[in-house]
């Protein structure tokens, strides 16, 4: 998964790109080692791995996996 696809999915899941950005800066997730989405991506985690954590955290439907 590319970063552009990751952010498209975030926008789809959260309803707007601005909310997706804020959420990704503020929501700390244990599944990302106690980091935010932004921190995990900046540390080099793959967008696919980060998306999986977001998907599980938000309890999104399988169709958005």
How would you label these PLM feature ranges?
Residues 1-65:
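C-terminal alpha-helical interaction appendages
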């Amino acid at each position: 998964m590319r970063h552009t696809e990751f952010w498209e999915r975030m926008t789809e899941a959260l309803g707007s790109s601005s909310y997706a950005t804020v959420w990704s800066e503020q929501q700390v997730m244990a599944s990302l080692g106690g980091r935010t989405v932004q921190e995990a991506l900046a540390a080099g985690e793959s967008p696919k791995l980060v998306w999986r954590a977001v998907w599980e955290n938000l309890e999104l439907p399988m169709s958005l996996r």
